[in-house]
């Protein structure tokens, strides 16, 4: 199997993918810094998820839609609001793609 210029499979080095996810804290600058940090760590690719809160959950405040684990960093937060914070705007894709490409990374 081939991904970009890399052969994937037995007797080949692992293909390492960094997940950008919502770790950008709603900042394109942070997102680009994370891409750079991943490249500095030697990853082969960046994976990006884009979703909207509406595609993940309902905008409800009942117990089923609140994080109740007191050990969680997101304790007592509504899922819908949490997904709003983690949302990666579609408009960022091209910029992140170009940064990944400039750094020699594949982009998913």
Question: Which residues fall in each region the model found?
Answer:
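Glycine-rich, proline-tolerant flexible connector loops at the mouths of alpha/beta enzymes
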Residues: 26, 44-87
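Aromatic/hydrophobic pocket-lining residues that form the small-molecule binding cavity
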Residues: 31, 89, 93
